Amino acid sequence: MGEQYDSDLHLHSQYSGGTSPRMVIREIARGAAKKGLDLVGTGDILHPKWRRHVRRELVEDEYGLLKEPKTGVLFVPTVEVEDERRVHHLIILPSLDHAEELHGELSRYSDDIDAEGRPHLRMTGAELADLLKDHDCLFGPAHAFVPWTSVFKEYDSLRECYGSAMDRVDFVELGLSADSDYADRISELHEYTFLTCSDAHSPYPHRLGREFVRFELEEPSYDVLKAAIRRKPGGRVVLNVGLIPELGKYNRTACARCKRQFELEEAERLNWRCPECGGTIKKGVRDRVLELADLEKPKHPNHRPPYLRIIPLAEIIAKALGLSTITAKKVRAVWNSLVRRFGSEIDVLIETPIEEIAEVDERVAELLKSFREGTVNIRPGGGGEYGKIITEEESEREEPRSRKPVQRTLDELIGRG
Ligand SMILES: [Zn+2]
Ligand SMILES: [Zn+2]
């Protein structure tokens, strides 16, 4: 049995559009360490300047992965690319040399590969998957259900997208608005390992690792990581951790401009045009999954690990203290004392006994407990607006749009304790 590695394999550097200028290796490593992540993707590794920065800042670890010397956080080269149908795919590579080689080959299909961290490629998903047959890498669709840039906004099945290169697909990244209960209602997806990743654009612990995968690896090497994702001996995925899907910003069908939410039939009747403001209505992940689902209920294959639903600690603290913003000084103070005392944000979120958290702050302990038990009330997100945690009273006023997700605790999920 190997050691556990909490891993976030999809994020972006400062060279992708709309990201924080603080997305540099030192800040990512510092944020990852505070969060409690052991392994993160570099993101954007086809970008030449970013690759040079990565080479400069990281050293090769004894098993061949990259390591940030100060924090000991491990990195693996990753990149997200956009194909000609605006579908996003995630690629995980063995080394910077492999990234260099892939950059050379994909340059022929891209005008912005040297300028944009998430390059656009003049090729289809099938052509990309086919080209990758000659490369050692892990490959799969990114945030598979989101309405703007995903495989299922464009196609009704993976086979439709990847065609005869279908066997090149190693995993499906679920995205923030979906979980394995959603995805396992589609039997085509049962054979794939699900990745839960943050797609972070800034290094703060409420972004980085807001979704992550817990791997068990015999050694922290690329080959063992690959074995874990392909479900071969040497490693395995033991846990997917992610946002409660209703908190994702594309969970419900909603107007992209004014955020008003619609039932699917209503949106169809309105021809996807918002009667309130004239904006475009975007199909929510939940409705898209319901369209694609061939199973009445999720049916998890034997290899599927448990899925733990959680949200960033700062958001729990802010809500527990009745503060409207997670950047409030008081939120940061409680966050710091919890993380200093118990090791990392992930430890506080899922491992530390509630009684010990109550010694720091009882209100936070109380709310965290209902999170772990899945009894918190949610106002679902949609149209680009994140969902929110709401009080019992607020939820009674809002029925039936909000609901209580129910989940078992981590100990129950993994049969521990
Ligand atoms: Zn993307
Ligand atoms: Zn609108």
Where in the sequence are the language-model features?
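Histidine/acidic-residue-rich catalytic or RNA/ligand-binding cores of hydrolases
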Residues: 17-19, 51-53, 149-156, 204-216
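Short acidic/histidine-rich active-site segments
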Residues: 191-207
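Cys/His-rich short segments
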Residues: 237-305
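Histidine-centered divalent metal-coordination motifs
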Residues: 10-14, 143, 201
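Extended substrate/RNA-proximal surfaces in nucleic-acid metabolism proteins
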Residues: 4, 51-170
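Low-complexity, acidic/Ser/Thr- and charged residue-rich accessory regions of DNA metabolism proteins
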Residues: 317-417
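Divalent metal-coordination and catalytic microenvironments
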Residues: 10, 44, 75, 91, ...
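An N-terminally biased module of ancient metal coordination in phosphate/nucleic-acid-related enzymes
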Residues: 1-83, 376-377, 389-391, 398, ...
